Amino acid sequence: MTTAVQPSDTTGFGGGPAGSRASDLIQFQEIMSESAESSSSSSQTNVSAANTLPRESNGQNYADDPSHVYTNIREIEELNSRPVPPTPRADAQPRRDLLNGWFEYETDVGRTFFFNKETGKSQWIPPRFIRTPAQVQEFLRATRTNLDTTCSFQGSSTSSSEEQKENKMRESLADDDRKSQLIEDEEVFDEVCDDVDEQSSPVIDLQSRPLPIPFSDSFTDDEDEDDVKPIEGSIASDSDFDEEPVPTSSRKASTASGVMMPHPYAHVSSFQSTFPRAKNEDTDKLASYVIPPDANETSKTPTAIRVRRPSPTNLRSVSFQNKCTVLKNVPMPQVLPTTSSSFDHHPQYHSNTPDRPILMEDSADFTPSSRCEERRGSGDGREPVRTIRCGDLERSENDEPAEKVVKPKKREWITNYMYLTTAHLILYKDQKSAEKHGKHYDAPQGVWDLRGASVTWYQDNRDVQKKKQRKYIQLELCNTKKYLLRGPNDTEAVEWYKSLEEVVAKLPSPGSSNQPMIDVTNGVARNPSYIGSTRPLSHALIPISRSMRRRDDPMSQSAIETVSTSVSTDEPRPSKETIIEKLRRFFRTRPTVESLKEKGIYKPEPVFGSTLSAICQHENSLVPKFIRVITEVIESKGLETDGIYRVSGNLSAVQKIRCQADQDNYKALVSEEDIHVLTGALKLFFRELTDPLFPISLHKEYTSAMQMPNATTRFKKFEELLSRLPNENRETLKMLLRHLNRVASHSSQNRMQQHNLAIVFGPTLFHNGDGAVNLATKNKKAGKKAKPSKKEETQATPVQSNSHLAFSMIMQSQIVQYLLESANKFDILKAPVNIGR
C-alpha cells in the first residue's frame, strides 16, 4: 500500500530542503506499509481476488492462461450466507457417515454441511442426536411401561422351569418394532441421561449385603479390566426411584414353607427382557448373583409391600458382562439444602444393620401426601428438611456481658436475609443473593447449626433510657458464640422467636459428634471432596470410566467448607490504628527511585522518561523519532477531530503505545485509529521528560521576558533565549510549533485555537521535573509531622504556593501562545527543521 502525504503549506513539517522532507516521507511510508501488511488478512484477500480478475495488457489475454485461477467472490459469499445449505447431488460422495441417516458433505467452496438422506434435511451445524423434552418424557414413559410389563420375581436361584419358559416366550414374542426402537434409543440415551443426571445425583440404593452387579460397556469403554478403584458411596436421590405396587400374580416367589413373599431384588429380573441384545448366559449369571442366600426367609406381610424400582437412567448403567464389582455398606446420607455445609450425625444415620431394608417400605406408614412432602435425601427415621421461615433480620455479635459494661461500644448491626430450616439458620446478603441463579445458588455468608443452641430474650442496657425498647433475640450456638437478632418490628421478632424455639426444641443434642461449623466470621470456601470425606469409606469397587471421571458429583460441588476456626478466633482483628502504623512503616522503609537507579535495579526507559539529549544521541538525530512519526500520523488521520489535544484518550491504549515505542516498535502507533489516544501519547512524552523542553534554568528568564511591556524588547529577548536552547530542544520545538499551527488552522472544525493549545501545552513544556512534585505530594499526604530528610531538602526545589503555581501556569501558557503567534517572525523558527546531526 502506497500512502502519499503532502505538506499543507510551505511552513509545515519538512519545509526545508527536499532531502530532509523526502527522507521523512520514505521513513513514514515504510512504517505505514509494514502496519498495513500485518493489520488484516481481509484486505490481502480482496487484493488477491482483484488481481485474479481477467485483464488485458499489451494486447495479451490472460483468461486462457492455465496458471491463473478465477473465482467469483460474490457467489462464494452468497453461498456461505444461506441459512440452509444446498442439497448434495446424487453422485456426490460424502466425507463421512455419521450414522442415523446423517452424512457429511462439502460444498464447492470447501464448507462442510450435513444432510440426512432419510428425512432430506440439510443443515450447516452438526446434528446433536438429542430429543426435545416432550420426546424425552415419552421415551421414559415407554421405557417404564416396558419395564412394568416385563418385570418378574425370582424367589430363589433354582427358579421353576415354568417361569423360565414363560420369560423366554415373552422375550421371543416381543414386538420387533419395540426392539428396534430400543436399539435406536440407546444411541441417544447418553444425551438424555446427561440431562436427567444434572437434576439428580448418581444413585446407589442397595441392601447392606454385598451385591455384585456387572456394569455396562458405557462405563468400561477403553478401560482395562483391572482399572477399578474404590469410591465412596454416592448420594441416593428419592427422585430416581418410583414407588409401584408389586402384582402378586407374576411377582411372587415360593419358599420352602409355602409362604409367598416378594423378593427385594425382584427388579433385577427385568433386565433380561429390557435389554434385547444381552446374552442368555450372562443373564443366568446375573440371576445367580442378585439372589442372596437368605432369599427364603419368610415375610409376614406378603401383599402390603411396595418395592422401589430403579429408573431407566440407572438401568442404563447395567449390562451382562463378567466384570463384577462389590457394593457394600453404602449409607443413605441426609442431604441438607445446597447452602448447608454438613450432614446430620444422627445415631440411626450410619446404621448398617441387616434388619433395615432399604428397598422396602411398609405401605401402612406410607401415604402419597407424606411422599410429596419429603425432600431429597430424607433418611429413615428423620424429619425431612424444609424451610420454616425466611425474611430480613439484623444481627450483631454479643461478646460482652451487658451488666459488666460501663461504657459499652456502639453495636454494629448487619442486615441479612435469613432462611430458617429444620436444622440450620442460613444467612444471605440480601433476598436477591438467596434466589436461584440458573441451576445453582450463591454461597451464603454463613450457616449456623441450631443443634444444642439456646434462644432467649435479651434486654440491652443501652435501651434503658429510651421510652420504647426494642425486642432482641439472643441466639447462643453450641460453639458458645452469642448473636443478637432483631426484626423490622416487634411482631416479626416474636414470630421469629417462636419459630427458633420450636426448631431448637425438636433438634437432638450434638452429643460427642463434632460437626464442623460454618460461621460468618470464617471464610466460606467450596470443596468438592468435602462430602466424600465426611462419610465412612464404603467397600465399593466400581470401574471408573472416562464419562464418570468427567462428570463430578453435583452434591459434592455444592458442599461448603470453612477455614479453620482456630485461626480466626486466636488472631484478633487488626484495628484501624494498627493498619495505619503498618502502612507508615512500609512507606518509611521503601527505597527511593534514586537509590534503585544507583543500584541498577531501576533503569530509565529509552524513549519515555528520558532526556531529549539521550534519546537523540541514541537515535543519532536532533528530533526524536517518536515526535516525527506521531505528528505525521495525527496530521494524516484527522486534524478536524473535535477537541483534539483537549479530550483525554484511553489510558490503557496510551500505555500500550508507550511500551511499544520503548521497544522501537511503532506499528501500534500507526494502526491506532483514536486521535485522542495519539494526542495523549504525545502529551505524555513531553510530560515524562526528565528535563523539560524549556530547561529549568531558563524558566525565570522566559517569565521576565514575557512581562516586558515593550514589544520590540520582548521580541529580541525571546530571540536570544531561543538561540540559547540546546540543538535537540530547539529543533524539537520548531517541529512541535509547526504541528500545533497546523492544528490551529483547522479551528473551525476542531474548535482548538492557538490560545487553547497554549493552555494545554504550557504546563507540559515548562514542568519543574519530578523532584518538587513528588516532595509536595509527600508533604501533603504525610501531614505536618512528616518532615523530609536533609538529603531531600538539599536536592529538591522549594515547593511553590498555590498562588505562585497559578501565576506560573498562566505565564507558561502565555509564552507558548506568543511563540505560536510569532513563529513566522523569528529567524530561528523559520529555518527548516534539521533532523540529522
Curated annotation (Swiss-Prot):
Q: Please give the superkingdom of this protein's source.
A: Eukaryota
Q: Where is the composition biased (Basic and acidic residues)?
A: 162-181, 371-403
Which residue ranges does the record assign to the WW domain? 96-129
According to the entry, every stretch annotated as the Rho-GAP domain falls at 610-827
Q: Enumerate composition-biased segments (Low complexity).
A: 33-43, 150-161
Q: Which CDD domains match?
A: PH_ARHGAP9-like, RhoGAP_ARHGAP27_15_12_9, WW
Q: Where is the PH domain?
A: 386-505
Please indicate if the UniProt record lists Cytoplasm as a keyword: no
A single GO BP: small GTPase-mediated signal transduction
Q: Where is the composition biased (Polar residues)?
A: 1-11, 44-61, 247-257, 556-569
Extract the ranges annotated as region (Disordered). 1-66, 150-181, 194-257, 338-403, 548-574, 778-800
* Site (described: Arginine finger): R646
A cellular-component GO term for this protein: plasma membrane
Indicate, by first and last residue, each region the UniProt record lists as having compositional bias (Basic residues).
Answer: 778-788
**Protein name in the entry:** WW domain-containing protein tag-325
Q: Which organism is it from?
A: Caenorhabditis elegans
